[in-house]
A protein has these predicted regions:
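Short beta-strand/loop motif that positions the catalytic acidic residue
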Residues: 215, 221-223
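Catalytic nucleophile-loop/oxyanion-hole region of alpha/beta-hydrolase
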Residues: 43-46, 72-102
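Conserved alpha/beta-hydrolase
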Residues: 53-76
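N-terminal cap/lid segment of alpha/beta-hydrolase-fold proteins
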Residues: 1-28
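Short alpha-helix in the alpha/beta-hydrolase fold that links the catalytic acid
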Residues: 217, 231-240
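Acidic catalytic loop of the alpha/beta-hydrolase fold
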Residues: 226-230
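Alpha/beta-hydrolase-fold enzymes
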Residues: 112-194
Length: 290
């Protein structure tokens, strides 16, 4: 299938509190066997995964991407959130949209980095509303984060350079040489974010840790061992502590934080597709092991 052999539809969808989110649907040309919703990371937007979606369409999996509130073409104060619960409720709106537009088709969620954090919150609060969840370099614990530094000293609505903000919140001295918190070549990400969006991690990371046994969704947890933003130990901790019976953990050698944009991105896409296909028509798998 050529990369043009799918349909693309864009639009705005209203959230639970009246904000409008920008949604991009890449639908396969044939009858879909699944729908995959992708949520991006902090300061990024949906377009970061333009190339990543093609293999899914080729396997008749419709892909829904959207810009989180305050990011990309979605409404909301730039780089700001009061609480990540707002984003978790937004994700639920997109899940319901995908179900309405694809009746009877299994829905999966893939969240990257901040999107992984939001996806884990959603899956814990609303167990098994989707067939499975993929957490890619998700912010799930705080092995790298200087959590004691939060809240940051700035006014919550004050803007901070994204790299400076991240450097002050993580143990990551090499970030000093970075120009933007994104994959190489991306110029669409926010260069400034508010202190509030960093502060908000403290509450919900602790909540995920306290409620880990409540997460029972089928879950695929992905990380690169060269990730200097979210340590693989976060993924290992979540894997070991989650209440899910069907859980798999994959740590990719030589892969960094933006693993879907990594040279091994095609391999990662293939692994996600295989994992999704294995779960079509199956409600519960036993522990798949590491």
């Amino acid at each position: 299938m050529n990369t043009t052999d799918f349909t693309k539809k864009t639009g705005m969808v209203e959230t639970h509190d009246g904000l409008k989110l920008y949604v991009v649907r890449n639908n396969a040309s044939a009858e879909p066997k699944a729908v995959l919703i992708i949520l991006h990371g902090l300061a990024n937007e949906h377009s970061l995964y333009d190339v990543f979606v093609h293999p899914f369409n080729q396997q008749n999996i419709n892909v829904y991407r959207y810009d989180a509130r305050g990011h990309g073409k979605s409404e909301g104060k730039r780089g700001y959130v009061k609480s990540y619960w707002e984003m978790a409720e937004d994700l639920r709106v997109i899940v319901n949209l995908a179900k309405q537009e694809n009746p009877g088709v299994p829905v999966f969620v893939l969240g990257h980095s901040m999107g992984g954090h939001v996806s884990a919150l959603y899956g814990t609060k609303y167990p098994n509303e989707v067939r499975g969840i993929i957490l890619a370099a998700g912010v799930l614990r705080y092995n790298f984060m200087n959590i004691g530094w939060l809240p940051r000293p700035e006014d919550p609505e004050e803007y901070i350079n994204t790299i400076d903000a991240a450097y002050g919140t993580f143990h990551l001295p090499e970030w000093k040489s970075m120009k933007t918190f994104s994959a190489p070549g991306d110029d669409s990400s926010l260069t400034e974010i508010t202190a509030a969006i960093l502060n908000a991690f403290k509450e919900t990371i602790q909540w995920l840790k306290d409620n880990c046994r409540t997460f029972t969704n089928s879950v695929l947890i992905l990380n690169g061992n060269h990730d200097t933003s979210v340590t693989p130990q976060d993924a290992i901790d979540f894997y070991q502590q989650t209440g899910a019976k069907d859980k798999s953990l994959r740590i990719y050698a030589g892969v960094n934080h933006f693993l879907m944009n990594d040279p091994k991105g095609h391999q990662i896409a293939g692994d996600v597709i295989s994992w999704i296909e294995d779960r079509l028509g199956n409600e519960v798998y036993e522990d798949a092991g590491i």
